[in-house]
Amino acid sequence: MSAKLLYNLSDENPNLNKQIGCMNGIFQVFYRQHYPPRRVTGDELKSLPSGKASDNVGDTNISADKKETEKSKKKKTAKEKQRGVSSESSSRLSFSSSPCSSSFSSADISTTASQFEQPGLSNGENPVREPTNGSPRWGGLMMPSDIRELVRSSIHKETRTRDEEALSQQPKSARANVSLLKESSPSRNSNEWSEGRRVVKLKDSPRFSYDERETRKTGAKLKETPRLSLDSRSNSFRSARSSCSPEPQELVTGHRRTTSSVVAKLMGLEVIPDEPVTIQNRENRFCDSPRPTSRVEVDLQRSRGFDSIKKMMPAKFPMKASPWAQVDGAKNQVKIPDATTLTVYGEIQKRLSQLEFKKSEKDLRALKQILEAMEKTQQLISKDDDDNKTLCSSNFMQRNNQPIPSAINTSSMNFKSSSIVVMKAATAPVFKDTGIAGSASFSPRNVALPNVKVGNLRQAQKVIPRKQSAMDVTPRPGYYKGQTESTMKNTSTRPLQSKSDMAKSGKIQKPSVSLRTPPKKLGFEKQSRPTSPKPELNKNQRQQLSRQQTESASPRRKPGIKSRGLQQSEDRLSDESSDLRSLRSDSNVSLASNLDTEVTSRYNYERNSDITEQHTPKQRSPDLGMRSLSKPLKVTVEQPSPVSVLDVAFDEDDSPSPVRKISIVFKEDDNLSSEESHWMNKNNNLCRSIVWPESNTSLKQPDAELTEGFMEDDAEFKNGDHKYISEIMLASGLLRDIDYSMISIQLHQAHLPINPSLFFVLEQNKTSNVSLQDNKHKGRGFGQQQTVNLVERSKRKLIFDTINEILAHRFAAEGCTKQPSITLSISTQRTHEKSSRGEELLQTLCSEIDRLQDNSKCILDEDDEDLIWEDLQSHGMNWKEIEGETPGLVLDIERLIFKDLIGEVVTSEFAAFPRMLSGQPRQLFHC
């Protein structure tokens, strides 16, 4: 009866339940911003907050009253005993689940409860039911459904009365609470009043007790835990919560699904669909699985089967060679797979298979040409070296064993290996089926030549032995032994030989021509036409052929005429080789194909032929090795940029630049061109001193005689360096006879006014004098004296080179190299000013040497700018000299820029396609 009355009273006065909270209610009213209103589900945990000491008394009283109210309510319903146990356990939950429950002891709770419940105890209330604090029986028991509904209804009431709550104040609420308690039940006994008060507090206490604050905070914590980390902390909360109270499975799965979707979006992954997932798929998710590696496999299995994966694996990384390493790299493309893919991985594979290296082919066309030329040249060089070694050895043995016969008609060349012969106007032997007819002494084995076998016998038999024309006097080239048997069998489909090969064969054969064969009918009127038509010969060719004919007919002529004729014939050999090919009936040679054959074979074989020709010194002319032959240059690694700004500068003959001697295509150091070899051979004659004496005897005069003209007048020449300078000037003739016309010629050729060999001539006098003194005083200090002599020699060499450079700068500054009119005017006045100009020049050189020696003794820490400024102030520099060095500098800069551009392009291509091109890019250029 009392319980029903209290329920009705609480419904009529909704503000009554709000004001019972004491200090908790005060905080709820004045500090509402610290208690954000949140809707809390009923299945969440409840725990005590970390309250202050001031809250302990009121809250403990409320919880104690709540226990008695629950017991009285559950007596009037069915199963009174079980409801009492569950009410005690639910009230115990508010104490045991709080993190701050350790601060309360059982003694404090019992004393607080006894203070508020003394009226009930005096009226006969049995306090035996209260001490249930010691043994909490909360294990896996479920919360009663009616208490859960009671908590939910109290929360809904709180939201309706929130505006009224803000206007209430603490003193009024306290007084209203006391008056309302007195007027509510004047006729009720103390037992019913205590039971009703407990029921009211039990009904609305979750809003003001520890449970309210605890549920709000725990709800906030549980909602924010998925955002704090990506590990399985949220799962631990769920497992702890499920162990306390069974929650609906739909809520858990929905919460997991939303959490995984949020995590997937944050990580940039695709969102998992909201379809019901199985246990196997849930294990593969990122939230619940410890390792996320199986996600790719699940996606691949979802789109296609395992068999389709195996089919697509070979096309994932297509093997493709670099476009510059192959001739038609753009044509070799990987076939596009026909199977359509549904995933991103299949699309990536499809695009990788369609990839082409077109951009690099456009940007690196110059690099492609260079690399192809390098590769082709390397193959040709290695092939020619092997062929030339075998050929040189065979030719050398042939010349030593037996001379080569006079003439052999080689109309068709389809042999395993052929001989190198010269055609003469004589009856030539003809090849038969059984052997060789003609000269009885001719035999391939006796001559130590390879066995000759006619490839086309019908054409060979058609060649009738007749008197050849004067064209047949020139050397006829043939195949070398170095060619393989397989290539010789295909002569009908490939060109026979290039111009360079013919030039080599003619060059080698000339020293080995047999001169013991008697000449026969060499006149033009006694010779018939050749077997095949030949082109007309011009006047120069006829004179050349007649000169060669007379030389071969009379071998006792002077060797100078013969060597001159041989040299001229070799110079024209490349021009006449096309005419010689017309004499062959079955040759079918095209000039275009011959020009595309080996480029460097001719030059390499010429070098080897010079070695073999050294064994026949009687027939070799002295000027044979110094001739200039027009031959193609070999392409090497070092090349200028494709488009140079100095292309016109190379064609200028009067350029004073030292780059004038450098050809467009760079060559190796050991392989010099004919122009450079010819220039270097004549260097000894051109690089003379200005007034170089005809004999060295005039230089071996005493030192006193050389310096007598200057030692008497000037005492400064007593210095050793000045004395040596005067010796250099007198020995070179600059002080005696200054001829500026010769200076202009000399500086233009050698860039130095004094021949460097003059130093060694002067040192002969020094060493002769020193050797006489060493012989007299040879003994204990002989080794030390040699060391001193070496030091002095090095010092004199340094002075000599310095004087030479100073003179070169001085003469170039006066304009003697570019203004011949000035040189002539100076040369006409040299008789009047010879002595004065000589003394002035000598004094200038001595002062310059002294200044340089003083600068060498300066402090090393001195600023470089001060030294340069001092040099500029002391003597004016000829800035026009730098113009001669400009082409070389520009070429070097162009080459460096070209290398850097190629390196950057290749590196960027490797970075753009790391999977297409495996391995590290090798360094292309070594600076």
Swiss-Prot record:
Highest taxon of the lineage: Eukaryota
Q: What ranges does the record list as Polar residues composition bias?
A: 115-125, 182-193, 483-500, 538-553
Task: Give the record's keywords alphabetically.
Answer: Nucleus
Which residue stretches does the UniProt record annotate as biased composition, category Low complexity?
Answer: 86-114, 232-245
The record's Gene Ontology biological-process terms are: regulation of monopolar cell growth; unidimensional cell growth
Observed effect of gene inactivation: No visible phenotype under normal growth conditions, but the lng1 and lng2 double mutant shows reduced length of cotyledons, rosette leaves, siliques and flowers.
According to the UniProt entry, which residue ranges have a biased composition of type Basic and acidic residues?
A: 146-165, 210-226, 569-584, 605-616
Chain intervals for the UniProt region annotation (Disordered): 41-198, 210-257, 460-588, 605-626
Cellular component aspect of the GO annotation: cytosol; nucleus
Keyword Transferase attached: no
Give the subcellular location: Nucleus
Q: In which tissues is it expressed?
A: Expressed in roots, petioles, leaf blades and floral organs.
InterPro entries the UniProt entry points to: DUF4378, LNG1/2
Briefly state the protein's biological role: In association with LNG2, regulates leaf morphology by promoting longitudinal polar cell elongation independently of ROT3.
Q: What else is known?
A: The gain-of-function mutant lng1-1D (T-DNA tagging) shows increased elongation of aerial lateral organs, partly due to elongated cells in leaves, petals and siliques.
Under which name does UniProt file this protein?
Protein LONGIFOLIA 1
Q: Which organism is it from?
A: Arabidopsis thaliana (Mouse-ear cress)
Q: What's the name of its gene?
A: LNG1
